[in-house]
Amino acid sequence: MQIPTDAVLLRIFIGENDRFENHPLYEAIVLKAREMHLGGATVLRGPMGFGHSSRLHTAKLLRLSEDLPFIVEIVDSEEKINQFLPVLDTMIGSGLVTIENIKVLQYGVKS
């Protein structure tokens, strides 16, 4: 599988406790992206953040927060990301979704 040099980065900002069909939402998103043969996906866990509610979520020891911020990043062509968006829309109830144009410098193992 190849990703074009001019590609798109899809970022999905959700909470650790968000669910889809009794599974963690971040896991369901990555598995669906894999099923749809998207170029790659990574889940990042944030130690601190806030969203539209302005409620602070933190991993500090003295203030154990549940529902830490998670970011799912998916990279592929604009066409394939656009095909994924309607599927994603059925999965997320709240969160922030962004798209950025990127340049892919390397994908996979160098020959």
Map each language-model feature to its residues:
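Positively charged, small/polar-rich N-terminal and surface patches that mediate targeting and assembly
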Residues: 1-111
